Amino acid sequence: MNESRTRTKLDQRRAPIYEALEQFRQMRVVPFDVPGHKRGRGNPELTAFLGQQCVGVDVNSMKPLDNLCHPVSVIREAEELAADAFGAAHAFLMVGGTTSSVQSMVLTACKRGDEIILPRNVHRSVLNALVLCGAVPVYVNPEVDKRLGISLGMKREQVEKAIREHPNAVAVLVNNPTYYGICSDLRAIVKMAHDAGMLCLADEAHGTHFYFGGGLPVSAMAAGADMASVSMHKSGGSLTQSSLLLIGPNVHPGYVRQIINLTQTTSGSYLLMSSLDISRRNLALRGRQVFHQVADMAEYAREEINAVGGYYAFGKELCNGNSVFDFDTTKLSVHTLDIGLAGIEVYDILRDEYDIQIEFGDIGNILAYLSIGDRPQEAFYAPKKSLPLRETEGMVCSEFVMCYPPGIPILAPGERITKEILNYIEYAKAKGCSMTGPEDPDILHLNVLA
């Protein structure tokens, strides 16, 4: 889709693939094609597990549903809507995860023997793409924050030096952001790459929300990057393994499609494609409001965690104008070593003892991934009331309750209060545990949703 089409602002209320599947479902077509479960009839256990609605639209490519390898109707329309929503010249629906998106991006830019400038902390999919195409990496080694033990972004002078020393490189690749939410100066790096006649590629596996959030770091397309791989399933709400590849006006979409078709399946999942279609519509219509709330939730959690002491939930205070040019405020990263626990230990405690599954834990940090799905009863924003402790059973809590140390929540905002939780709180109080978090320091009352 060309630039003028992008500016027309298509009707983002549409979801062409979803609409086509709904029409197809109503046609009651008799299946003598694949998949062999025949709309679930051939595998009742699978149907019972996933549901008839799901297996009923797990179908093969056909004329009314278009073909992912050569889209001409509803898939093409869905890609045009995605490009419009993300401010790209063209968008490709990807069903092999962002790994396939990243690899297609690199294979488009690089041939055997070409050099590509990239940070050392790239995802393995980038390096696997270099193995496939025979391109040569030129590494930029980002600095490491000594206290937190995390890699930062690429400094402008590091990228400038790499471009100067490798003038024949064909592209510069940037993480936008890193796993921990660290962003490089993307606009400056794009300009340096373009001034040197190179493409700028962005791995935005963790940056879908940048396209829909005021106050968040700049997105790759807004910064002028040539290609970006976007994990819609991470923070955008689509199904796992669904992704987007976005390109700018300087990259030929026909060639990109050829590259994608070298490795992507010829049996594109309509479950994944429809999830991309529906999720794009949701983001286009409601994403800005939702991600503003997500950022507010993360900031509230940072303040509460840092008030406990011992833990350090880091944020925009890390920004230094260069190696940490910006920070993704939706990321809730917490440094744990100061309380004598490795991040992986806190990860295990949260999962095994509290049934809380966070994204990961490393040697010194944990990461809780907040996204479009983290709006538990609007707990941070809804009206609240204070009730005596024992009268809160069955209510939704609107504040933290924790013993310190270790400072791990017994109750968190948005969590329903059970009898067992109340028993535990009273037991901990009776044993003299230091209780923190609630507005009432004696925890005789709790704030709940009104």
Protein language model features and the residues they cover:
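Active-site PLP attachment segment
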Residues: 219-258, 264-275
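PLP-dependent aminotransferase-like
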Residues: 114-174
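N-terminal "arm"/small-domain region of PLP-dependent enzymes with the aminotransferase-like
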Residues: 1-73, 404
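Structural signature of PLP-dependent enzymes
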Residues: 279-302
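Conserved C-terminal alpha-helix-loop-beta "cap" of PLP-dependent enzymes
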Residues: 303-416, 423-437
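Conserved beta-loop-alpha segment that forms the PLP phosphate-binding cup at the N-terminus of a helix
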Residues: 90-116, 129
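Active-site phosphate-binding strand-loop segment of PLP-dependent enzymes
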Residues: 148-209
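Conserved N-terminal alpha-helix of the aminotransferase class I/II PLP-enzyme fold
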Residues: 55-97
